[in-house]
């Protein structure tokens, strides 16, 4: 009688016991999967259905802290991802599609300041990249197309004034480039052609007086 009562008490626990790391007759991953480091600590844990990751996957550093969290959708082809420092603060956040970076990715310092924002398409930089000072002020804007610099490139001083204006065309610097002093006066300017300085480049003092002229076509 005691054995019967003990068995009946164990039934609820047995019913909720999940096996892990299983594949079906077709070799497809099903249910909960876990992997560990050589030291025995958990590397990741998540769930599969017909070999496709589903729901939330948790990834860990070998020392035990949470490293990343991925929320899978679209039959496991896309994952909203958050990556963490060991202190638990957010390091990066963005989207993976078919295991490639896609859309907007943001990167943060260890004290939670946004340091960079990038736009991706199919794993390549595509769109605007913004870089920030540790104060949070904008430092740089650069445009990309299919993984190469293409379009306007602008840098700023800490106070928000423009520091430099330039441009890229197919990964090469092209057209006019201007550098400024912190007071807003032009430091120097000139042209780029095929990623090389071209023609006349003129340098100025902070008072706006022409100081040096160089001709790169001679």
Predicted stretch roles:
Residues 1-21:
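Bacterial Sec-dependent N-terminal signal peptides
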Residues 16-218:
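Glycine/tyrosine- and acidic-biased, solvent-exposed loop/turn segments at the edges of beta-strands
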């Amino acid at each position: 009688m005691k054995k019967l009562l003990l068995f009946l008490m164990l039934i609820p626990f047995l019913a909720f016991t999940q096996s892990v790391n299983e594949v079906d007759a077709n070799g497809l991953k099903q249910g909960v999967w876990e992997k560990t480091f050589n030291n025995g600590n958990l590397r990741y844990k998540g769930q599969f259905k017909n070999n496709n990751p589903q729901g939330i996957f948790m990834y860990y550093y070998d020392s035990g802290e949470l490293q990343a969290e991925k929320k899978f959708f679209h039959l496991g082809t896309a994952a909203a991802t958050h990556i963490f420092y060991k202190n638990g603060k957010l390091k990066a956040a963005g989207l993976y599609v078919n295991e490639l970076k896609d859309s907007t990715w943001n990167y943060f310092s260890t004290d939670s300041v946004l340091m960079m924002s990038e736009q991706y398409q199919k794993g390549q930089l595509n769109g605007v990249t913004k870089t920030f000072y540790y104060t949070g002020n904008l430092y740089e804007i650069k445009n990309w197309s299919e993984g190469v610099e293409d379009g306007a490139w602008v840098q700023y001083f800490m106070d928000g004034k423009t520091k430099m204006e330039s441009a890229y065309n197919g990964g090469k610097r092209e057209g006019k480039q201007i550098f400024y002093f912190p007071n807003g006066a032009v430091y120097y300017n000139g042209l780029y052609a095929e990623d090389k300085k071209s023609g006349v480049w003129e340098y100025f003092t902070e008072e706006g007086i022409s100081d040096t002229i160089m001709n790169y076509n001679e």
